[in-house]
Amino acid sequence: MTNFSSSPPIAFGDLQGCHAAYRQLFDTLAPAADTPLWFAGDLVNRGPASLATLREIAALGERAIAVLGNHDLHLLAVAAGIRTLKPGDTIGEILDAPDADDLIEWVRHRPFAHFERGMLMVHAGLLPQWDAALALELADELQRALRASNWRDTLRSLYGNDPNCWSPDLKHADRLRVAFNAFTRIRFCTPEGAMEFRANGGPAAAPAGYLPWFDAPGRKTADVTVVFGHWAALGLMLRENLVALDSGCVWGNRLSAVRLADDPAARVVTQVACERCGAADE
Protein backbone atom coordinates (compact mmCIF):
# COMPACT_ATOMS: atom_id res chain seq x y z
CA MET A 1 0.00 0.00 0.00
CA THR A 2 1.41 3.38 -0.98
CA ASN A 3 1.23 6.63 0.93
CA PHE A 4 1.60 9.05 -1.98
CA SER A 5 -0.88 11.92 -1.71
CA SER A 6 -1.26 11.94 -5.51
CA SER A 7 -0.53 9.20 -8.00
CA PRO A 8 2.80 7.46 -7.33
CA PRO A 9 5.57 8.96 -9.45
CA ILE A 10 6.94 7.32 -12.55
CA ALA A 11 10.74 7.52 -12.69
CA PHE A 12 12.51 7.47 -16.06
CA GLY A 13 16.08 6.49 -16.81
CA ASP A 14 18.56 8.58 -18.78
CA LEU A 15 16.87 9.89 -21.94
CA GLN A 16 20.01 11.41 -23.51
CA GLY A 17 18.13 12.87 -26.43
CA CYS A 18 16.29 9.65 -27.34
CA HIS A 19 13.02 11.44 -27.98
CA ALA A 20 11.29 8.74 -30.04
CA ALA A 21 11.91 6.10 -27.37
CA TYR A 22 10.69 8.47 -24.66
CA ARG A 23 7.49 9.20 -26.59
CA GLN A 24 6.90 5.48 -27.11
CA LEU A 25 7.47 4.76 -23.43
CA PHE A 26 5.29 7.67 -22.31
CA ASP A 27 2.46 6.61 -24.62
CA THR A 28 2.74 3.01 -23.40
CA LEU A 29 2.49 4.16 -19.79
CA ALA A 30 -0.31 6.65 -20.54
CA PRO A 31 0.07 8.25 -17.10
CA ALA A 32 -2.81 10.16 -15.58
CA ALA A 33 -2.49 13.93 -15.65
CA ASP A 34 -1.75 14.07 -11.91
CA THR A 35 1.09 11.53 -12.09
CA PRO A 36 4.44 13.11 -11.16
CA LEU A 37 7.19 12.32 -13.64
CA TRP A 38 10.70 11.90 -12.27
CA PHE A 39 13.80 11.99 -14.48
CA ALA A 40 17.14 10.73 -13.18
CA GLY A 41 19.22 13.22 -15.16
CA ASP A 42 21.00 13.26 -18.51
CA LEU A 43 18.00 14.41 -20.48
CA VAL A 44 20.28 15.33 -23.37
CA ASN A 45 23.37 14.43 -25.39
CA ARG A 46 24.57 11.62 -27.63
CA GLY A 47 21.07 10.76 -28.80
CA PRO A 48 19.64 12.17 -32.05
CA ALA A 49 17.00 14.55 -30.67
CA SER A 50 18.35 16.43 -27.66
CA LEU A 51 16.49 19.63 -28.52
CA ALA A 52 13.09 17.97 -28.88
CA THR A 53 13.63 15.98 -25.70
CA LEU A 54 14.61 19.01 -23.63
CA ARG A 55 11.73 21.09 -24.94
CA GLU A 56 9.21 18.38 -24.14
CA ILE A 57 10.39 17.79 -20.57
CA ALA A 58 10.63 21.52 -19.86
CA ALA A 59 7.08 21.98 -21.17
CA LEU A 60 5.80 19.58 -18.49
CA GLY A 61 6.27 22.36 -15.95
CA GLU A 62 6.07 21.43 -12.28
CA ARG A 63 4.90 17.93 -13.14
CA ALA A 64 8.46 17.05 -14.17
CA ILE A 65 11.12 16.63 -11.51
CA ALA A 66 14.46 16.25 -13.27
CA VAL A 67 17.74 16.12 -11.37
CA LEU A 68 20.92 17.30 -13.03
CA GLY A 69 23.18 14.77 -14.72
CA ASN A 70 26.70 15.13 -16.05
CA HIS A 71 25.50 15.62 -19.63
CA ASP A 72 23.03 18.32 -18.58
CA LEU A 73 25.86 20.09 -16.79
CA HIS A 74 28.09 19.69 -19.84
CA LEU A 75 25.41 21.55 -21.80
CA LEU A 76 25.57 24.39 -19.27
CA ALA A 77 29.36 24.41 -19.35
CA VAL A 78 29.49 24.62 -23.15
CA ALA A 79 26.84 27.36 -23.13
CA ALA A 80 28.94 29.26 -20.58
CA GLY A 81 32.15 28.92 -22.59
CA ILE A 82 33.75 26.73 -19.93
CA ARG A 83 33.97 23.62 -22.08
CA THR A 84 33.84 22.89 -25.80
CA LEU A 85 31.78 20.44 -27.79
CA LYS A 86 33.27 16.94 -27.98
CA PRO A 87 32.96 14.32 -30.72
CA GLY A 88 29.62 12.59 -30.29
CA ASP A 89 27.94 15.54 -28.58
CA THR A 90 24.45 16.29 -29.88
CA ILE A 91 23.74 19.41 -27.85
CA GLY A 92 24.77 21.87 -30.56
CA GLU A 93 21.19 22.04 -31.81
CA ILE A 94 20.11 23.26 -28.37
CA LEU A 95 22.72 26.01 -28.34
CA ASP A 96 21.68 27.10 -31.85
CA ALA A 97 17.94 27.06 -31.13
CA PRO A 98 15.94 30.32 -30.96
CA ASP A 99 14.82 29.39 -27.44
CA ALA A 100 18.33 28.42 -26.31
CA ASP A 101 18.49 31.01 -23.52
CA ASP A 102 15.20 29.84 -22.02
CA LEU A 103 16.24 26.20 -22.19
CA ILE A 104 19.62 26.88 -20.59
CA GLU A 105 17.90 28.80 -17.80
CA TRP A 106 15.50 25.90 -17.25
CA VAL A 107 18.35 23.41 -16.99
CA ARG A 108 20.32 25.70 -14.68
CA HIS A 109 17.43 25.74 -12.23
CA ARG A 110 17.06 21.96 -11.92
CA PRO A 111 17.95 20.34 -8.59
CA PHE A 112 20.80 17.96 -7.83
CA ALA A 113 18.61 15.81 -5.59
CA HIS A 114 14.95 15.27 -4.84
CA PHE A 115 13.53 13.63 -1.71
CA GLU A 116 9.95 12.56 -1.24
CA ARG A 117 8.24 9.83 0.80
CA GLY A 118 11.49 8.17 1.79
CA MET A 119 12.82 8.14 -1.79
CA LEU A 120 15.95 10.09 -2.71
CA MET A 121 16.63 10.66 -6.42
CA VAL A 122 20.07 11.69 -7.68
CA HIS A 123 21.76 11.19 -11.03
CA ALA A 124 24.82 9.08 -10.18
CA GLY A 125 25.12 8.29 -6.49
CA LEU A 126 26.02 9.21 -2.95
CA LEU A 127 28.98 8.91 -0.63
CA PRO A 128 28.70 6.42 2.24
CA GLN A 129 29.23 9.04 4.97
CA TRP A 130 26.18 11.02 3.89
CA ASP A 131 22.75 10.46 5.33
CA ALA A 132 19.76 11.80 3.42
CA ALA A 133 19.75 15.05 5.38
CA LEU A 134 23.39 15.83 4.55
CA ALA A 135 22.91 14.84 0.92
CA LEU A 136 20.01 17.26 0.63
CA GLU A 137 22.00 19.99 2.40
CA LEU A 138 24.85 19.60 -0.09
CA ALA A 139 22.45 19.46 -3.03
CA ASP A 140 20.89 22.69 -1.84
CA GLU A 141 24.30 24.38 -1.60
CA LEU A 142 25.08 23.35 -5.17
CA GLN A 143 21.67 24.40 -6.43
CA ARG A 144 21.89 27.84 -4.85
CA ALA A 145 25.40 28.33 -6.25
CA LEU A 146 24.33 27.34 -9.75
CA ARG A 147 21.32 29.63 -9.64
CA ALA A 148 23.32 32.68 -8.53
CA SER A 149 24.46 35.43 -10.88
CA ASN A 150 28.09 34.21 -10.79
CA TRP A 151 27.08 30.66 -11.76
CA ARG A 152 29.62 30.49 -14.59
CA ASP A 153 32.53 31.00 -12.19
CA THR A 154 31.04 28.45 -9.82
CA LEU A 155 30.54 25.85 -12.54
CA ARG A 156 34.12 26.31 -13.75
CA SER A 157 35.38 25.60 -10.22
CA LEU A 158 33.37 22.38 -9.94
CA TYR A 159 35.23 20.47 -12.65
CA GLY A 160 38.12 18.36 -11.37
CA ASN A 161 38.78 15.08 -9.56
CA ASP A 162 40.24 16.36 -6.29
CA PRO A 163 39.48 15.99 -3.51
CA ASN A 164 37.95 12.59 -4.22
CA CYS A 165 36.57 11.81 -0.77
CA TRP A 166 34.36 13.47 1.78
CA SER A 167 35.44 15.28 4.90
CA PRO A 168 33.25 17.52 7.05
CA ASP A 169 36.22 19.90 7.15
CA LEU A 170 36.01 20.63 3.40
CA LYS A 171 35.10 24.20 2.58
CA HIS A 172 34.09 26.36 -0.36
CA ALA A 173 34.90 24.95 -3.82
CA ASP A 174 36.38 21.69 -2.48
CA ARG A 175 33.20 20.91 -0.56
CA LEU A 176 31.02 21.66 -3.57
CA ARG A 177 33.27 19.75 -5.98
CA VAL A 178 33.10 16.55 -3.95
CA ALA A 179 29.31 16.81 -3.83
CA PHE A 180 29.13 17.64 -7.54
CA ASN A 181 31.19 14.57 -8.44
CA ALA A 182 29.22 12.23 -6.21
CA PHE A 183 25.83 13.43 -7.43
CA THR A 184 26.76 13.35 -11.12
CA ARG A 185 29.79 11.09 -11.76
CA ILE A 186 30.34 8.36 -9.18
CA ARG A 187 30.13 4.65 -9.97
CA PHE A 188 32.84 3.09 -7.82
CA CYS A 189 34.42 4.07 -4.52
CA THR A 190 36.57 2.46 -1.85
CA PRO A 191 34.90 1.15 1.30
CA GLU A 192 35.92 4.47 2.85
CA GLY A 193 34.24 6.48 0.08
CA ALA A 194 37.19 7.58 -2.10
CA MET A 195 35.75 8.00 -5.60
CA GLU A 196 37.16 6.52 -8.83
CA PHE A 197 36.25 8.28 -12.08
CA ARG A 198 37.71 6.23 -14.95
CA ALA A 199 35.97 2.85 -14.82
CA ASN A 200 32.52 2.71 -16.42
CA GLY A 201 31.93 -1.04 -16.75
CA GLY A 202 29.56 -3.10 -14.65
CA PRO A 203 30.11 -4.05 -11.00
CA ALA A 204 32.23 -7.06 -12.01
CA ALA A 205 34.68 -4.65 -13.64
CA ALA A 206 35.36 -2.74 -10.43
CA PRO A 207 39.02 -1.70 -10.11
CA ALA A 208 40.97 -3.42 -7.36
CA GLY A 209 40.03 -2.01 -3.98
CA TYR A 210 36.80 -0.43 -5.24
CA LEU A 211 33.16 -1.45 -5.17
CA PRO A 212 29.87 0.01 -6.39
CA TRP A 213 29.07 3.10 -4.34
CA PHE A 214 25.79 1.59 -3.14
CA ASP A 215 27.59 -1.46 -1.69
CA ALA A 216 29.94 0.58 0.50
CA PRO A 217 29.72 -0.82 4.04
CA GLY A 218 27.79 1.33 6.47
CA ARG A 219 26.30 3.54 3.75
CA LYS A 220 24.14 6.00 5.68
CA THR A 221 21.46 6.30 2.98
CA ALA A 222 20.62 2.59 3.25
CA ASP A 223 17.56 3.61 5.29
CA VAL A 224 15.95 5.35 2.29
CA THR A 225 15.29 4.22 -1.27
CA VAL A 226 17.83 5.75 -3.66
CA VAL A 227 16.65 6.26 -7.24
CA PHE A 228 19.43 6.93 -9.74
CA GLY A 229 20.61 6.62 -13.35
CA HIS A 230 24.01 7.29 -14.98
CA TRP A 231 25.36 3.73 -14.99
CA ALA A 232 24.36 2.12 -18.28
CA ALA A 233 26.62 -0.90 -17.77
CA LEU A 234 24.82 -1.63 -14.50
CA GLY A 235 21.46 -1.58 -16.23
CA LEU A 236 18.04 -1.71 -14.64
CA MET A 237 18.43 -2.94 -11.07
CA LEU A 238 15.80 -3.11 -8.36
CA ARG A 239 16.60 -3.81 -4.74
CA GLU A 240 14.53 -3.09 -1.68
CA ASN A 241 16.24 0.28 -1.21
CA LEU A 242 17.68 0.91 -4.70
CA VAL A 243 16.20 1.69 -8.10
CA ALA A 244 18.83 1.92 -10.87
CA LEU A 245 17.20 3.23 -14.04
CA ASP A 246 19.80 3.66 -16.79
CA SER A 247 19.40 0.69 -19.12
CA GLY A 248 21.49 2.15 -21.95
CA CYS A 249 18.89 3.50 -24.36
CA VAL A 250 21.41 5.76 -26.08
CA TRP A 251 23.60 2.71 -26.74
CA GLY A 252 20.76 0.94 -28.55
CA ASN A 253 19.49 -1.04 -25.57
CA ARG A 254 16.31 -0.14 -23.67
CA LEU A 255 14.67 2.85 -22.00
CA SER A 256 13.21 2.04 -18.60
CA ALA A 257 10.59 3.60 -16.36
CA VAL A 258 9.52 2.43 -12.92
CA ARG A 259 6.25 3.31 -11.26
CA LEU A 260 7.49 3.83 -7.73
CA ALA A 261 5.75 2.66 -4.58
CA ASP A 262 6.45 2.62 -0.87
CA ASP A 263 6.28 -1.18 -1.01
CA PRO A 264 9.11 -2.42 -3.26
CA ALA A 265 6.95 -5.35 -4.35
CA ALA A 266 4.42 -2.91 -5.80
CA ARG A 267 6.83 -1.24 -8.22
CA VAL A 268 5.97 -1.66 -11.89
CA VAL A 269 8.65 -1.70 -14.61
CA THR A 270 7.97 -0.68 -18.22
CA GLN A 271 10.60 -0.74 -20.97
CA VAL A 272 10.86 -0.03 -24.68
CA ALA A 273 13.57 -0.94 -27.16
CA CYS A 274 15.87 1.79 -28.45
CA GLU A 275 17.10 0.52 -31.81
CA ARG A 276 16.82 3.99 -33.35
CA CYS A 277 18.88 5.71 -30.67
CA GLY A 278 22.42 4.44 -31.00
CA ALA A 279 25.29 6.75 -30.04
CA ALA A 280 28.79 6.47 -31.40
CA ASP A 281 31.24 4.50 -29.30
CA GLU A 282 32.96 6.54 -26.61
UniProtKB/Swiss-Prot annotation:
EC number(s) recorded for this UniProt protein:
3.6.1.41
The record's listing under InterPro entries reads: ApaH (IPR004617), Calcineurin-like_PHP_ApaH (IPR004843), Metallo-depent_PP-like (IPR029052)
Q: Report which superkingdom the organism of origin falls in.
A: Bacteria
**SUPFAM superfamilies in UniProt:** Metallo-dependent phosphatases
Q: Name one Pfam family in it.
A: Metallophos
List keywords of the entry alphabetically: Hydrolase
Q: Where is the signal peptide?
A: none
Similarity section: Belongs to the Ap4A hydrolase family.
HAMAP family per record: ApaH
Q: Which NCBIfam families match?
A: apaH, PRK00166.1
State the name under which the record lists this protein.
Bis(5'-nucleosyl)-tetraphosphatase, symmetrical
Species in which this protein is naturally found: Burkholderia mallei (strain ATCC 23344)
